[in-house]
Amino acid sequence: ALSVMSSFNDFDGIPVSGNKWLLTDILRNELGFKGFVVSDYNAINEMVKHRVAADGKEAAELALNAGLNMDMVDGDYYKYAEELVKEGRVSEKQIDRLCREVLIIKSKLGLLDDPFRYGGEGRWDKETCLPEYMEASRKVARSSMVLLKNQNDILPLKENARIALIGPAADSRSEMLGTWNAFVSSKNAVSF
């Protein structure tokens, strides 16, 4: 993996986004992870709600010192990183390391040469929605399903059986994508 996302939950009372033991000692030092860690949506600032940080500045300090490379959305790194370095609460060496780890991955992916490499008109369909990738997606979906209960042996359906899908999203391909789907076109939704 080139990137890992920290989760919202805590481990032993410390939110993962500010947990140095998990992000640095275990992930990097013990497991040898060489990529970068990104926070989940607003997870750094959520440490204030967890009551382990008094405010966004302290939350940013915890996350930076824990080894969390990238702040998704809440902006606490942007707002406070320079100030935290000036105050000596986060070392410049730590900031350099966190930035370097992100830039190494961006370089490996060719994003320093072409930052729009994986975006732009038609590139998504042409480069990522290839038939072999779509088939791999179907295979993953099929093999990851688990039937927890099969009351009255209703499954598998008999060949001549019919089912009804009812509700406002019953015939909506875009609903198969769910939330947080970025820029995926519903025509590329994988179903079987």
Predicted regions and their residues:
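Glycoside hydrolase catalytic-domain context in secreted enzymes
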Residues: 1-192
